[in-house]
């Protein structure tokens, strides 16, 4: 009797384990994300060379280190270069050339709370990316970052021969000895603006114009946001918005940005080969026109000489940054978010202000040398870790 009971108990245990195992497999099958066959093959190739895990976690942190949580500290070793010796800076970013009297804003480095950022080495960057193509795609903040990286590399290898072509929409800088080319593709909305019978139409569902130029790069750094806030047909560059079959004069700009960025995400998923190309999103660069955000009502970036202390911005987060995070989370392609928003919000002192050469007050872009050098240092760290 005892033998029969023990046998029955053993059979019941095996049956329960079989059922649970089958349920686990079914659940795993249901939760498995959809990945195209091409990207399955590409991801397998990346994993095979030890990079898959790093790329797949790229939306969050790098090697357990949050590069973007920290504070600004005074650093006498900064800046990385002298603007007067860099031939690639546009006047609108060359604040010292146009008379900015203070230089303390150049002497701050970003210190993450949980790790140390490796110092940028332009020659090491060129050697690692020898024969490669790097492209920044976006608006004038992409221009800001592109020129910064060009100057940072140039300061490390000042005697190397370069080929510099600046055109619209595609510019390039090639470091000939290393066969490394930095491209800039200017497209403020990422999605298309087309000429139709009614006028210029911002098409939230289309990326066709020029997007072939983005393909087959080794590193892509995308950016978009500032132009989505522009109003008035001259400033915004379009007359109508097309959303599916609807054609309208205007719509909620955050909603439009969300739809346009979703279209961009779909383009990346369909066209980027992750075994060849690493993809970054530059993150949302803030402005400093409203001093109430940092408890100085009626102030702007004009006359600001020091960054905010601490690691949080009094004005809080930006809704556009949440949209970027949401869109990236829905994509199959691993896109690393270069989450520069908060650390840039703390730098109310780093804008051209009245020293951009055009007579206005610019609290949108950034002086060079300056904050975009830190963006590139963090890009360098993310690529190195």
UniProtKB/Swiss-Prot annotation:
One of its GO terms (cellular component) is membrane. GO terms for biological process: jasmonic acid mediated signaling pathway; plant-type cell wall modification. Keywords: Membrane, Signal-anchor, Transmembrane, Transmembrane helix. A motif (GDS motif) lies at residues 138-140. GO terms for molecular function: O-acetyltransferase activity; sequence-specific DNA binding. It is a single-pass type II membrane protein. It is found in: Membrane. Its main location: membrane. InterPro entries: TBL (IPR029962), TBL_C (IPR026057), TBL_N (IPR025846). PANTHER family: PROTEIN TRICHOME BIREFRINGENCE-LIKE 37, PROTEIN TRICHOME BIREFRINGENCE-LIKE 9-RELATED. Contains 2 motifs that are conserved in esterases, but it is unlikely that this protein belongs to the catalytically active pectin esterases. May act as a bridging protein that binds pectin and other cell wall polysaccharides. Probably involved in maintaining esterification of pectins. May be involved in the specific O-acetylation of cell wall polymers. Belongs to the PC-esterase family. TBL subfamily. This is Protein trichome birefringence-like 37.
């Amino acid at each position: 009797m005892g033998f029969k009971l023990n046998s029955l108990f053993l059979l019941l245990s095996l049956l329960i384990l079989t059922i649970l195992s089958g349920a686990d497999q079914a659940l795993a099958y249901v939760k498995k994300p959809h990945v195209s066959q091409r990207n399955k093959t590409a991801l397998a190739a990346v994993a095979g060379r030890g990079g898959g895990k790093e790329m797949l976690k790229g939306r969050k942190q790098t090697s357990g280190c949050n590069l973007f949580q920290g504070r600004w500290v005074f650093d006498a070793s900064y800046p990385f270069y002298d603007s007067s010796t860099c031939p690639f800076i546009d006047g609108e970013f060359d604040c010292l050339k146009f008379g900015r009297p203070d230089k303390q804003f150049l002497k701050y480095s970003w210190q993450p709370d949980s790790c140390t950022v490796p110092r940028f080495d332009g020659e090491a960057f060129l050697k690692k990316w020898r024969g490669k193509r790097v492209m920044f795609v976006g608006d004038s903040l992409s221009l800001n970052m592109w020129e910064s990286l060009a100057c940072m590399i140039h300061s490390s290898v000042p005697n190397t021969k370069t080929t510099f072509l600046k055109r619209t929409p595609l510019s390039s800088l090639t470091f000939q000895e290393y066969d490394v080319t930095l491209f800039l593709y200017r497209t403020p909305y990422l999605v298309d603006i087309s000429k139709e019978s009614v006028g210029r139409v911002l098409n939230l569902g289309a990326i066709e114009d020029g997007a072939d130029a983005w393909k087959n790069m080794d590193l892509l750094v995308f950016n978009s946001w500032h132009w989505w806030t522009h109003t008035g047909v001259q400033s915004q560059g379009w007359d109508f918005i097309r959303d599916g079959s609807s054609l309208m004069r205007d719509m909620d700009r955050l909603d439009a940005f969300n739809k346009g960025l979703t279209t961009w995400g779909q383009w990346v998923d369909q066209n980027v080969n992750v075994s060849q190309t690493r993809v970054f999103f530059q993150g949302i660069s803030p402005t400093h026109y409203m001093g109430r955000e940092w408890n100085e009502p009626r102030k702007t970036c004009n006359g600001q000489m020091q960054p905010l202390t601490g690691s949080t911005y009094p004005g809080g987060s930006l809704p556009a940054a949440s949209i970027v995070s949401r869109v990236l989370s829905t994509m199959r392609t691993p896109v690393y978010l270069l989450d520069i928003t908060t650390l840039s919000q703390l730098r109310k002192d780093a804008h051209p202000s009245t020293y951009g050469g055009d007579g206005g007050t610019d609290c949108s872009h950034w002086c060079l040398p300056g904050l975009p050098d830190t963006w590139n240092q963090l890009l360098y760290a993310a690529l190195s870790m």
